[in-house]
Curated annotation (Swiss-Prot):
E.C. no: 1.2.7.1
Temperature dependence: Optimum temperature is 80 degrees Celsius.
pH dependence: Optimum pH is 10.0.
Alphabetic keyword roster: Oxidoreductase
Catalytically driven reaction(s): 2 oxidized [2Fe-2S]-[ferredoxin] + pyruvate + CoA = 2 reduced [2Fe-2S]-[ferredoxin] + acetyl-CoA + CO2 + H(+)
Origin: domain of life: Archaea
PANTHER family in alphabetical order: PYRUVATE SYNTHASE SUBUNIT PORC
Subunit structure, interactors included: Heterotetramer of one alpha, one beta, one delta and one gamma chain.
UniProt GO molecular function: pyruvate synthase activity
Protein name: Pyruvate synthase subunit PorC
Length: 177
């Protein structure tokens, strides 16, 4: 079973990202689940969300404590929350940052999701960009399923723009090695 933990701030779309990822995995023929964890529920407060993906039915019904992957939508959270907490020894972190970031604790992939979102969406909402990057890094979900679910979640022009932003991030990460 693959377990993913998303870190974001209220209003950034971490919960929606976890749900879209689970639906895309289901679209690819896998079992999946997604759920949020809220502390103080207010815009800007740290939020976690979780996705599990498996080839067999998932019986677990609790938050992810030892993720295989951590997706950080806001690099400022690295200084506020222990995003590496419980990360498996061979775990991977995907971090939204325009800069570089290294850690002795994890393999880290970075992408300027905010820049891609601003260029393609006109807003710094990075959830779909990070999902495209996640698909490119991991191959856990197909980009076609991800784009289909993004367009179902956000109909019309907004969905098209989010799908394109996800595809750009996917291509960037898929070819980054």
């Amino acid at each position: 079973m693959i377990e993913i933990r998303f870190h974001g701030r209220g209003g950034q779309g971490a919960v929606t990202a976890a749900e879209i990822l689970a639906k895309a995995a289901f679209e690819d023929g896998k079992y999946s689940q997604a759920f949020p964890f809220f502390g103080v529920e207010r815009r800007g407060a740290p939020v976690m969300a979780f996705t599990r993906i498996n080839d067999e039915p998932i019986r677990r019904r609790y938050q992810v404590y030892n993720p295989d992957y951590v997706v950080v939508l806001d690099e400022g959270l690295v200084d506020v929350v222990d995003v590496f907490s419980g990360l498996k020894e061979d775990g991977v972190v995907l971090l939204n940052t325009a800069g570089t970031f290294t850690s002795e604790n994890a393999k880290i992939h970075t992408i300027d999701a905010t820049g891609i979102a601003l260029e393609n969406l006109g807003r710094p909402i990075v959830n779909t960009v990070m999902l495209g990057a996640f698909a490119g890094v991991t191959g856990l979900v197909s980009i076609d399923s991800l784009i289909k679910i993004i367009k179902e979640t956000f109909p019309g022009k907004i969905g098209d723009k989010n799908a394109e932003a996800a595809r750009i991030a996917y291509e960037k990460m898929k070819h980054s090695g």
